[in-house]
Amino acid sequence: MSSSMECSEFVGSRRFTGKKPSFSQTCSRLSQYLKENGSFGDLSLGMACKPDVNGTLGNSRQPTTTMSLFPCEASNMDSMVQDVKPTNLFPRQPSFSSSSSSLPKEDVLKMTQTTRSVKPESQTAPLTIFYAGQVIVFNDFSAEKAKEVINLASKGTANSLAKNQTDIRSNIATIANQVPHPRKTTTQEPIQSSPTPLTELPIARRASLHRFLEKRKDRVTSKAPYQLCDPAKASSNPQTTGNMSWLGLAAEI
């Protein structure tokens, strides 16, 4: 009743004054109304569904139906859905464990024995060998034989290297024994430097050596600071001076 009284007063005041209330006044009145009533009341305007006594809805809802606006496309889609089949993008590969789990133990043992007994087929291929300046070609040569050849070649090279090393060491030892020690040679075999005498030289060589010595003597005397006599004249007339000396003519000359 109080709310109806307030509403009537509010309407009457608007009629008498002719002025609109302010926003603050409306807010204050709305807050007072909420404090008194606690809620806005029934604002559903009769659109809410009222439940029956048994707990079921009063107005039972009918099931909704979809309308196909594009019937042609719908039929195509249905056919496509029917045709689609699930594809296994990652197929599970059968493993030995899965097969062995399903098989009995005897079959599993047989399978393992057969797999062990089966040997890989020997593959053949052409083979070329270069040895001692020759080229040897085999058209069909198995891998096992090739391995044997390689092993033999490796053993042969190892043996040849060992022999070469032993030969080199023996040669070095013999050379070291042949070379004399320098200290022993100096003491045992003194150096004998004997100059060859002039008598052993041939006559022609000895005459040329005398001429060379005479010329050298003349050059030495000519380069002296002063000369007592002309060496050319002295060498040309030695006998005349000796013969004339006893006659007392040496002073005049």
From Swiss-Prot:
Q: Where is the Tify domain?
A: 120-155
Q: What is the effect of changing R206A?
A: Loss of binding to COI1but no effect on MYC2 binding
Subcellular location(s) per record:
Nucleus; Cell membrane
Q: Which residues bind jasmonate?
A: A204
Report keywords, A-Z: Acetylation, Cell membrane, Host-virus interaction, Jasmonic acid signaling pathway, Membrane, Nucleus, Plant defense, Transcription, Transcription regulation, Ubl conjugation
Motif interval(s): Jas: 202-227
> Where is the motif (Nuclear localization signal)?
204-211
What superkingdom does the record give? Eukaryota
**GO molecular function terms listed in the Swiss-Prot or TrEMBL record:** identical protein binding
Designated name of the protein: Protein TIFY 10A
Naturally occurring in which organism (per UniProt): Arabidopsis thaliana (Mouse-ear cress)
Give the gene symbol: TIFY10A
